[in-house]
Amino acid sequence: MYYHIIKSPIYPILLAGDEKGLKHLIFLKDERKAKIPNDWVENKDFFREVSNQLEAYFSGKLKTFDVKLAPQGTEFQKSVWKALCEIPCGETRTYGEIAKRIQNPKAYRAVGLANNRNPIAIIVPCHRVIGANGKLTGYASGLDIKEFLLKLEENNLK
């Protein structure tokens, strides 16, 4: 598995993946505490394209990513993550709407758990999922990041 850490406007980001695609995009709130497995190999060039796309996203020039993804999860989780990728930049959906989208309308809590386990933040945009009351709810990386990303997208659409 290859990895590379890039800078972002909010926190450093750990990218990890292999020839199958990107497996992880994780915000490092404290880079010093990042636990990189010993068998992972630093490879900046491997992540050049995704790094360029993330830079364009943060600068407001990119709204849709074109990155080969290889997240690891259950079939249910993968169906949720696929549905998340259909939410346009600058828009939000509720957990219930995602549950209906994957044709499992009662599974809104399970959708929330799948969101929480999303290994590829930003590109699989779990930050675009909000509570039924319109409020920001759970985000594995922290509500500060969720709020930052939603405001970034809102401002970039103006």
From Swiss-Prot:
EC main group: transferase
Where in the cell?
Cytoplasm
Q: Give the Enzyme Commission number.
A: 2.1.1.63
Principal subcellular localisation of the protein: cytoplasm
**InterPro entries from the UniProt entry:** MethylDNA_cys_MeTrfase_AS, MethylDNA_cys_MeTrfase_DNA-bd, MethylDNA_cys_MeTrfase_DNAb, MethylG_MeTrfase_N, MGMT, MGMT_N_sf, WH-like_DNA-bd_sf
Q: Which SUPFAM superfamilies match?
A: Methylated DNA-protein cysteine methyltransferase domain, Methylated DNA-protein cysteine methyltransferase, C-terminal domain
Q: Cite the active-site annotation.
A: C126
Q: Where are the transmembrane segments?
A: none
GO terms, biological process: DNA alkylation repair; methylation
**Of which family is this protein a member?**
Belongs to the MGMT family.
- Cited function: Involved in the cellular defense against the biological effects of O6-methylguanine (O6-MeG) and O4-methylthymine (O4-MeT) in DNA. Repairs the methylated nucleobase in DNA by stoichiometrically transferring the methyl group to a cysteine residue in the enzyme. This is a suicide reaction: the enzyme is irreversibly inactivated.
Query: Any extra detail in the entry?
Result: This enzyme catalyzes only one turnover and therefore is not strictly catalytic. According to one definition, an enzyme is a biocatalyst that acts repeatedly and over many reaction cycles.
- Annotated protein name in UniProt: Methylated-DNA--protein-cysteine methyltransferase
Q: Which species is this UniProt entry from?
A: Methanosarcina mazei (strain ATCC BAA-159 / DSM 3647 / Goe1 / Go1 / JCM 11833 / OCM 88) (Methanosarcina frisia)
- Gene, per the UniProt record: ogt
